[in-house]
């Protein structure tokens, strides 16, 4: 799937499929919706929308995700274009010194679950409202020369969070964020994938 240069594509959530490359050409931008109803909800433990809005996804699976893949071996995102996560739609400036993100929902930008032989190459992500790239239960993950440029006032806007993954290579990336640039995780929410 190719997003051609010179366009901004406004989108609800995207579900990556097996062996599909989402290629964002240089000069193309895909911008996440500000409408929370347009997001995929992978956290099957949350059935009550009110709980999803106040629940903290740090220890569980994300409540809302912009780009999602499940059992999508060989999927990838590539190209020199931009993913604009539209994070400021989900946080508010409390005062001149502090942006609050203590309320939810705050969607994860990319959550790839139980998928092997996957890659993320060359693109830029800006303005994440929460974690940026969260592979979980994956094997053979390549993250190569991506740039993550998040607002330094937005708490928990982690860069790259491999969670219960194996054989992960992170090469030549640039990450600017208000929390962990790279954090290896073994979260409770993804414990089904082992250590």
Stretch-by-stretch model annotation:
Residues 1-195:
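Extracellular/periplasmic carbohydrate-active domains that bind, remodel
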């Amino acid at each position: 799937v190719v997003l051609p240069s010179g366009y901004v594509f406004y989108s609800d959530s995207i579900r990556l499929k097996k062996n599909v490359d989402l290629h964002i050409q240089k000069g193309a931008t895909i911008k996440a919706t500000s409408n929370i109803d347009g997001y995929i909800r992978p956290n099957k433990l949350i059935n009550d929308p009110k709980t999803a809005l106040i629940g903290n996804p740090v220890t569980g699976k994300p409540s809302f995700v912009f780009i999602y893949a499940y059992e999508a071996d060989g999927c990838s995102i590539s190209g020199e274009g931009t993913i604009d996560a539209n994070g400021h739609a989900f946080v508010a400036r409390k005062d001149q010194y502090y942006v609050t993100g203590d309320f939810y929902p705050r969607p994860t930008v990319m959550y790839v679950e139980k998928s092997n032989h996957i890659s993320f190459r060359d693109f830029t992500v800006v303005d994440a409202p929460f974690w940026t790239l969260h592979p979980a239960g994956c094997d053979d993950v390549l993250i190569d020369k991506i740039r993550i440029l998040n607002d330094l006032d937005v708490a928990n806007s982690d860069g790259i969070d491999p969670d219960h993954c194996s054989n992960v290579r992170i090469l030549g990336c640039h990450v600017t964020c208000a929390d962990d640039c790279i954090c290896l995780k073994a979260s409770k929410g993804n414990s089904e994938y082992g250590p």
